[in-house]
A protein has these predicted regions:
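Charge-rich, low-complexity N-terminal segments
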Residues: 1-155
């Protein structure tokens, strides 16, 4: 059996609001916010320092996500933002509020803890694989709405 090395990192400090329009009949259909955070699992062979992933690597990396450093990308996506699905029937109104400076809108294919776990895993995995020439992969992301509710995505 081949040994597998994993390390984890928690990213926190994001105040994020959601609109889950498909959650009809529940209070989650309304705009609501959380102090969200997420945990990332890195897997790969240790480097010359015996590290799978540099715990400060998101700050010291060379690559970018959408033209931003990884931490700036995380802040852009999650810090003091409103997340809405691309098929939200009120998207035009939310875009107008964004245009007026009332909110910072981020439009994603889907929203919710499960959708965010997947989105983060896919984007971070592509970044980390490129940054490490394929030596390390992001194999799991757990997204927390709060300390009691989370969703995990593993491809």
């Amino acid at each position: 059996m081949t040994a597998r090395y994993q390390s984890t990192k928690v990213f926190q400090g994001f105040s994020t609001a959601f609109r889950q329009w498909r959650a009809e009949g529940t209070h989650c259909a309304y705009l609501h916010g959380y102090d969200v955070f997420f945990k990332v699992w890195f897997e790969g062979e240790p480097d010359h320092r015996n590290w799978v992933w540099d715990f400060g690597g998101m700050s010291r990396c060379q690559g970018t996500i959408d033209g931003m450093s990884p931490r700036a990308w995380m802040d852009h996506l999650l810090d003091h933002t409103v997340l809405a699905a691309e098929d939200d029937p009120e998207l035009d109104m939310l875009r107008e509020l964004d245009r007026r400076g009332v909110l910072q809108l981020r439009v994603l294919p889907a929203v919710g803890a499960e959708a965010l776990a997947r989105h983060l895993q896919e984007r971070l995995d592509a970044f980390v694989a490129a940054e490490t020439a394929g030596r390390v992969r992001v194999v799991r992301v757990e997204f927390f709405e709060n300390e009691r509710n989370s969703a995990i995505y593993e491809p």
